[in-house]
């Protein structure tokens, strides 16, 4: 049984992430969307909120589960018996970073391979940070994230604005 881990902050998960996850779920017996718990990083949503949003987004994919990790991703992957890390590539700049990380990860955990999936062209310019910025200014993000996440973004920024007033 091949277990693959797709790690990211997912703050929030986007349609680009979900496209990669859906395609990766067809390649491996089990896919774990691993939400990075990074207390030192300023994130819009808590780890628990991100996990809940992702679970709702991938409920239709039977071999996908969602978990959180706070260690090195290679340590987490080995701990759960994974042999593959999944990464999505949007552009050449992503490739450079992922190429370096794949080599570092392989050095740290030689039994782990990295598989990169090219982003669907509809999502090559899509990022969580761009979605957050659009949402922060009241823009429509409904074509970039599932409806429940668009609503959560709207509510998060309304709450943020109300607390600043």
From Swiss-Prot:
It is an enzyme of class 2 (transferase). Its main location: cytoplasm. It is found in: Cytoplasm. Pathway: Cofactor biosynthesis; coenzyme A biosynthesis; CoA from (R)-pantothenate: step 4/5. One of its GO terms (biological process) is coenzyme A biosynthetic process. Disulfide bonds: none annotated. It holds the Pfam family CTP_transf_like. Its cofactor is Mg(2+). Its EC number is 2.7.7.3. InterPro entries: Cyt_trans-like, PPAT, Rossmann-like_a/b/a_fold. Gene3D superfamilies: HUPs (3.40.50.620). The record marks 17 as: Transition state stabilizer. The keyword Acyltransferase does not apply. GO terms for molecular function: ATP binding; pantetheine-phosphate adenylyltransferase activity. ATP binds at residues 9-10, 17, 88-90, 98, 123-129. It catalyses: (R)-4'-phosphopantetheine + ATP + H(+) = 3'-dephospho-CoA + diphosphate. NCBIfam families: coaD_prev_kdtB (TIGR01510), cyt_tran_rel (TIGR00125). Reversibly transfers an adenylyl group from ATP to 4'-phosphopantetheine, yielding dephospho-CoA (dPCoA) and pyrophosphate. Belongs to the bacterial CoaD family. This is Phosphopantetheine adenylyltransferase. It comes from Herpetosiphon aurantiacus (strain ATCC 23779 / DSM 785 / 114-95). The gene is coaD.
